[in-house]
């Protein structure tokens, strides 16, 4: 990302979930940290997280419908969705006052908290899809549907958080 310092306030508001992830994981290699003191308004972060989740759900559903018979393409979609889904889980946990060392750990913690065994079984497949860009025959469709369900579940928990704040 190549962004001017003057553009930061607008960009942070427009892409609150993305910048939340940047704030969590940034490492300054040279010079001063342009994000020192940056705070994202909670209500903006909640609204943007809701948008990101809805977009992810819609995109994954479209992939499933349009390319569901092509498992190699589903595996790529799973790999591509892993980062945003993990980041969404990390943001939700952060909004709930919990911290995790990585977005991957945040997603695992979230899934464990739901008690959904199918989702827990899907987690290693997500990593496998990211690393190998392919999954064993007959697996990708179920994993992708599980990702949609996880994203919907994160959205439901986010909605409860929003309601609790009103």
Question: What kind of feature is each model-predicted range?
Answer:
Residues 17, 24-31, 55-62, 66:
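Alpha-helix capping at helix-to-loop junctions
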Residues 39-166:
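Conserved nucleotidyltransferase catalytic core and NTase-mimicking acidic/glycine-rich helix/loop elements
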